[in-house]
Amino acid sequence: MIGAVALALAAAVPDAAVDAARYDAFWLWAGVRPQPVLRQARRLYLLEGQVDAVPTVRLIAQRPAVPHVAGAEIWMVVRVATLRWSPLVYRQLLAELARWRAAGNRVAGVQIDFDARTRHLGEYAAFLADLRRRLPGDCRLGITGLLDWSANGDPAGLDALAGVVDEVVLQIYQGRHVIPGYAGYLARLGRMTVPFRIGLLQGGEWRAPPSLAANPRFRGYVVFLANPARR
């Protein structure tokens, strides 16, 4: 009940800068300093590493050490530049997942952060289906998504994702800026066939469309934490 009330309150704030203190799910990226709001987190998406394509395909760690998080559910995030993974990358990912869990973290899933082109979602779904088969049975699989998917995504590709991933977090920002006209994309969220969350930028603009809270696939928000601007 408390989570539902918080969700409704957050959705009701029009045109306000995103106040992280009103939310309970956060991304914490490399180079971003921890903030007091993390103490209220129920779900954390922590960047573990990045799969680079050059000079060779490899998983490069982005954290100095294995995290130790008490209480909050953890999603291990991997930023991906290529889907052509070598067997070594899969082994590295699974080994890191095991280390995070062995350290006492409640790791619920792996999130893949990849800028899949809107017209090639079917290919992305095939990669994700293969990855899912390699993950432990109790490990969920999530992805980040582009707002364009809701408006122009191939219906067959969206349906393929629905059979593979547990959630998509649709980001209304690129880099450190909110996408202009994001409301137009959100108006078409009825096309989404996968449970989804909305990714917000700390301090960025946000106005929830009236229909969002009633969407049966809407699961809440994730706030991308950012370092305060230097003065």
Task: Please state what every model-predicted region is.
Residues 11-231:
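Secreted glycan hydrolases and related glycan-binding modules that recognize and/or cleave
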Residues 2-11:
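Sec-dependent N-terminal signal peptides
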